[in-house]
């Protein structure tokens, strides 16, 4: 059976700047891929191509057996690909419940009765049910991050693209978020860009390293993080450091 996501020989450049240099990857449901690399490595550009924000110059993106390169960005959520951002973007004047309900209605395209039920289920799953009637703009940062995930889940996404979602949190909050993301693997495929290696290591089944738009490594987190090349280009440590 084909993988949920199949990216083949993806290429993108802006003049002399290469952001995707023949990138290929596959991802199945219930698998988390941690995506790391220095700033400018092409991580966000890869997400932008997966979500249709930018078009690749070449290569193929297949999702759930379908070539999605012609699917417009605003329709990718209906296909099943949703991105959660580093800086949460809730509708601040709406309640937490209304934010999630909106995602269920317009992201998933559910009818109102089903959307209402699904929104409550999602709030419970993400630990936000007790905040359902609170204005989203009044949430603390960790709960705004939870809401970002809740909206993605409510849209019935199959693939979650997490873009540095743990950024700005305390260590304790990071590990709370890790627990939630780990629980989401049971029903989703996840690609997670993050600069907190131990958080990724706690969730990811694989890690992929990008550098100047090229895939350098793809393998078990322990092997990738122990690589002398990764230690040098990503962590800024000498390749032979203990």
Positions of the model-derived regions?
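Glycine-rich phosphate-binding loops of nucleotide-dependent enzymes
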Residues: 2-242
């Amino acid at each position: 059976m084909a993988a949920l996501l199949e990216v083949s020989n993806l290429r993108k450049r802006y003049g002399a700047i290469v952001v995707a240099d023949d990138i290929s990857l596959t991802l199945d449901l219930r698998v988390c891929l941690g995506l790391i690399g220095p700033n400018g490595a092409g991580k966000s550009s890869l997400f932008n191509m997966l979500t249709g924000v930018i078009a690749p110059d070449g290569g193929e993106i297949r999702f759930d057996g379908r070539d999605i390169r012609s699917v417009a960005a605003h329709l990718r959520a209906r296909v099943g690909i949703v991105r959660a951002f580093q800086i949460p973007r809730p509708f601040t004047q709406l309640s937490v419940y209304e934010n999630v309900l909106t995602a269920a209605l317009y992201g998933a395209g559910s009818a109102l009765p089903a959307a209402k039920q699904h929104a409550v289920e999602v709030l419970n799953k993400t630990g936000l049910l007790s905040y359902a009637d609170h204005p989203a703009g009044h949430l603390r940062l960790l709960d705004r991050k939870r809401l970002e995930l809740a909206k993605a889940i409510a849209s019935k996404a199959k693939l979650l693209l997490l873009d540095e979602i743990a950024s700005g949190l305390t260590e304790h909050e990071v590990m709370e978020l890790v627990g939630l993301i780990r629980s989401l693997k049971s029903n989703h495929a996840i690609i997670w860009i993050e600069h907190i290696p131990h958080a990724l290591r706690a969730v990811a089944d694989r890690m992929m390293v990008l550098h100047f738009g090229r895939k350098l490594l793809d393998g078990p987190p322990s092997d990738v993080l122990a690589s002398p090349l990764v230690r040098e280009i990503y962590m800024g440590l000498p390749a032979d450091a203990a």
